[in-house]
Amino acid sequence: MFLLGHSCWSYIFSKITGRQVKSSLPAYMALLAGVLPDFDIYFKPLIQHHTYTHSLIVLVPTCAVLALRFRGLGLAFSAGILSHLVADSIVGTIPPLYPLSDLQVGISLGLPSPADTALEVGALGIVLVIAYLSREYKLVTESHKEAVYLAIPLVSIVTLTLLFAGDNNVPLAEFAFSRKALTLITLGHAALIGILGLGVFQGARAVITTRKQPGHPSSPPSGEAQPSGSPLPSNTSP
């Protein structure tokens, strides 16, 4: 699956799990979790893509540690990570027992394929609905300092896409519009990147505005210093 689907399904599974355990995972972490297994691309050729970071032997213990250490937030984040393996096993295969075995397991519906396109574009639609109902869409439409952290999944999605294309000698612009299915997925990526970019802009604007306010540590002192607040809105706390 492409990063559009991975980030969106991660958001969906993380938010659903977080609601069940009464922990609200920030939007940027919910989007990032499902992208993490593809971080092996950053470490090529030291680590071959689609090996260790796509193995249950590696990820299940990692997620267990996260859940034990961070409780509800760890469970929600882990749900996003594991959604990556579920998605890849639907449209392709994964090596669940690597490095003990090279066995590949999956339904392998195809990539790209109508099924994959429906899963990826559909996931983006579900994310927009959840963001609207949970009011997280305000990270994009209003100034909130937390929104600046959306830069993390934004940069990850863009750089991983470029690196993967470069490593595999894929002419990205030509490939993106070579088939109708890919065109829809490309437009979905563009929409997601645009939304995240707008959120980062709103976050940066909020940070700059806060720093200019009297009483902020970076502003000239005016009377008694005021304690600075948390950079995260209270509604994102567990």
What is the role of each PLM region?
Residues 1-221, 225-238:
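N-terminal membrane-targeting hydrophobic helices
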